């Protein structure tokens, strides 16, 4: 069973365009109703607003009713009465309104917006600079009034400023240092008394003592560190073998060693290499004296023995006496001895000479006996 519509839609050009022409005609005829509200709007207060709104509503209702009837007839309506007016360029009496550009150019405010600009590159800036300058001037007036108000207002409480540093006089510093040497810490009464003496406040005295204590501690610490560094450098220099280091030379100069050095030149004259020292000369002279005394005692004993054994034969050989009259070399050596010993030697000299003659005689007799 074929489903065919009862009413066929004509597709010819005349069938399609004829309903549109009729609808345009009706819209044009009924569009005159919109002229009344527009005319009333242009006249301003000639008609009350309520009447103008009522007329506008009636005209709009008529256009909508016409469009509804055309839709029911089977022709689709794609335009409104206002749309038709916009499309055709006029809407009843809307064509009487001048364009927006002409209105703005002819108005009083037109030159402010569209005035002649010397530089055509900045058309948009000129339209904003004019009103902005007036606005800025008015704003500056407001700022000036604010400045006057700020002058009259009391300043806001800010952070406390640091006081200027007070320089103490030499007398004050001397008194503070003298008291610091005596006592590093002061009680409140002592602090007040010292402050009154040197014309300072107790707070200033307190702060000065605190700073000076810290200064002394820091100086002592730096001094100890410096001494420790010097000791470390002096002890480690021997292992490193750096004899030319100035720190090591300074340490050697500070602690010299005493070494016996032979004197080669004294008072500009060269000393003898074998010359004994003064102490050694005194010891040698004492030993010589002891040896001389022992030799003299031995000679005295020998002389006594020779006198007791053969004193009669002394005169048998007188030729030997002249030789005995002279001093012997031993006596010449003893002459250099002290005066006390010279007396003893002189008393025994004749005995020594006689003893020597007797010895010579005995030796000669034996020699003669052997030869014969």
UniProtKB/Swiss-Prot annotation:
DNA-binding region(s) in UniProt: 161-220
Modification after translation: Phosphorylated on serine residues by STK3/MST2.
Residue segments, region Disordered: 219-258, 269-288, 312-340
CC annotations in GO: nucleoplasm; nucleus; transcription regulator complex
Localization annotation: Nucleus
Keywords in alphabetical order: Activator, Biological rhythms, DNA-binding, Homeobox, Nucleus, Phosphoprotein, Repressor, Transcription, Transcription regulation
Record's compositionally biased regions (Gly residues): 233-244
Any GO BP: telencephalon cell migration
Main location: nucleus
InterPro entries registered for this protein in UniProt: HD, HD_metazoa, Homeobox_CS, Homeobox_NK-like, Homeodomain-like_sf
Residues modified as Phosphoserine: 255
Coiled-coil spans in chain: none
Domain of life: Eukaryota
Task of the protein: Transcription factor that binds and activates the promoter of thyroid specific genes such as thyroglobulin, thyroperoxidase, and thyrotropin receptor. Crucial in the maintenance of the thyroid differentiation phenotype. May play a role in lung development and surfactant homeostasis. Forms a regulatory loop with GRHL2 that coordinates lung epithelial cell morphogenesis and differentiation. Activates the transcription of GNRHR and plays a role in enhancing the circadian oscillation of its gene expression. Represses the transcription of the circadian transcriptional repressor NR1D1.
Similarity annotation: Belongs to the NK-2 homeobox family.
Subunit structure and binding partners: Interacts with WWTR1.
Name listed for the protein in its UniProt record: Homeobox protein Nkx-2.1
Organism of derivation: Mus musculus (Mouse)
